[in-house]
Amino acid sequence: FKEFDKRAGIVVDIGSSVTDLAAVREDKIVAGCSFYIGGAYYTQQISDYVLKKYGLQITFAEAEKLKLKCAGLYPNDVSFGTVAGLNINKGAAEEITVTAREIYDVLAALTDKLCQVVTSLLLTVPQETSAYFKESPIFLCGGGAQLSGMEKYFFDKMNMGVLVPSDSFLAAVKGAKLIL
């Protein structure tokens, strides 16, 4: 993050199974934690939703396809996706259409939990540095940061600036490169 130079900020790396958070100031981590909700958990929750609502058991790959095609954090999104699976009530294959609006509630609930963890992290920042973080942005990275609407959702919930680089899924690798 070029925007991060000599500033403070909260880094939220939404990986596949874990989200890592760090409050960083002047190249030092002053507080951090890991939260066991990542992109794969979002996908699993979509699969669970489809099973509960439609009685359709879909594979993780089908749920991931749905997440990538139409899921997002825009409540008025009118897109939709089609998934196929096993109807557990009929014992037969079936294909259904799921709207982005349906999935929004599932994703919003998970992202609200993530925002709560960021808020908790901000409360653990040492008092003498807390003012820096109130004026600093949240940096979202990792593959999960690419979820449609994630940046705006965080901005609306956290009332803080939010930055997501176009290559956010490579942020951890690029960061590791700097220390090697």
Where are these regions (language model features)?
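Glycine-rich phosphate-binding loops at beta-strand->alpha-helix junctions
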Residues: 71, 75, 129-154
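Conserved phosphate-binding catalytic cores of ATP/NTP-utilizing and phosphoryl-transfer enzymes
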Residues: 1-12, 174-180
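Conserved helix-loop functional segments at active or binding sites
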Residues: 120-128
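Residue-level signature of catalytic and energy-coupling elements of molecular machines
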Residues: 13, 46, 83, 118, ...
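Phosphate-binding glycine-rich/basic clefts of nucleotide- and phosphate-handling proteins
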Residues: 25-115, 123, 133
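Conserved phosphate-binding/catalytic loops in two-lobed NTP-binding clefts
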Residues: 154-177
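Extended, folded domain segments that form the structural surfaces/walls around functional sites
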Residues: 1, 5, 13, 147-153, ...
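A short acidic Gly-Thr/Ser loop motif
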Residues: 4, 11-18, 24-28, 38-40, ...
